[in-house]
Amino acid sequence: MQHKIYIAATNQHVGKTTVTLGICAALRNQGYRVGYCKPVGQEFVSLENNLVADKDALLFAKTLDFKLEPHIHSPVILGDGATQAYWDSPSEYPFRRQIQEAVQHFTPELFDWVVLEGTGHPGVGSIVGLSNAAVARMTGARVILIVRGGIGKTIDEMAMSLALFHQEGVRVEGVIVNKVLPDKIEKIRHYLGKVLNAWGIPLLGVIPYDASMMFPLFELIRASVRGKVLFNPEYMENRIAGIVTGSLVETYDLRNQSNILLVCNAIRLPEVLKKVIKVAEVQGLTHPDIAGILVTNSEDGHPLVASDAYCMDFIERYQVPVIESKLDTYGAALRINAIEVKINTRTPWKAARATELVQEYVALDDLITIFETRPA
């Protein structure tokens, strides 16, 4: 018997895509034939032949190795202006039919599980009749709800989300809590477990916060500060795990941090790089693990940096990508801190880690048993 599972979340940025990817991979690892669909998407990528697909559908196609067919894996895109266009002429946008036809391609003869990934919070899409709850109902799927780590606010958000699914007659079969600080895991498991037990909903997993899932690529940082690449563009996909400013280099423990972003004013860069080398030597390191340099307060820092032999030797020897930004160091730090890091096709290590986290912290056997033993 085929099972349709709809992965919803109480909010954006809770980790829905990460958990969905982990569940798909974990089911596959158990020998099941798994199909994936993002019925309603908002952020899309352009493909060949003037086609578009949700960016998450592209991620899953590459990670799970299937041919991306937008009309099947990403049937509806609600981009800018879509909702206004819909209400100007609803008959021209048969969204429901597109979703139903997409799901029909996942026949029981070919797929044991169909995993449908939701969009945003449960109410997203309501303006065109495609809330997460409505889509789950029309596709005949049952819901697993992903919630943020917490107690009071998390329970409030769950209650609001569950009300919408109940209104549509859709059953929520379990809850997975994501991004929980390690020292809060048992407390959250205890209290959320009590509440969910009273509601008759299983707690299927508590996934700890994993810092590596939040590491941005240097290219994402460049975009956030509207920077320009000065040197070594081929290394712009270095991952960034920590940040140090030039003024704090001498107090920074380089031994406990890898993939460091150095943020420094262009004029002070030669002096700061010498300090980096000195600190590394004092701390017993053969070389500092600098993954990128952001030169601040700079509109055309290339001549200034290129004219300094020490800077160029450091950049070339350690193959460090360098960008510049007009922002000052404080302004750049604010922009970087505001980055919302998403799993994508350029971060394959995150896809692998997502699978590990789900396999380790989600009771997948319980999830399977629920779907196999309880009638749809």
What are these language model-derived features?
Residues 2-376:
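Flexible phosphate-sensing "switch/lid" loops adjacent to ATP/NTP-binding sites
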